Amino acid sequence: MNKTYTEISGWIVERIAHHAELEPRQITLDTEIVNFRLDSLLMVNITSELEEWLGMDLSPSIFWEMGTIGATTEWILENQEA
């Protein structure tokens, strides 16, 4: 079953908040991913977890390519299989 915008963005916010040692409420969907200062290996691991949760393949660099949580979520929504 496809996930909603709120489900996907919430999942990403929770993971980034955890690893960046922030409260989820401190993270906005339009903040550039690079501002969270998470290393590329960690972001690849988050992407791998996200792939498993979504049941779809993602580019290991999707967060860097899309730039923000909001843009990443939009891309996922547009590319989920119906």
Language-model segments: residues:
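Phosphopantetheinylated carrier protein domains
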Residues: 39-67
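Residue-level recognition of oxygen-bearing side chains
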Residues: 32, 68-71
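Thiotemplate assembly-line natural product biosynthesis machinery
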Residues: 1-25, 74-82
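N-terminal sensory regulatory modules of PAS/LOV and PAS-like folds
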Residues: 24, 33, 63
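N-terminal helix-turn-helix DNA-binding core of bacterial DNA-binding proteins
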Residues: 30-36
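Short polybasic/polar patches that bind polyanions
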Residues: 18, 34, 52
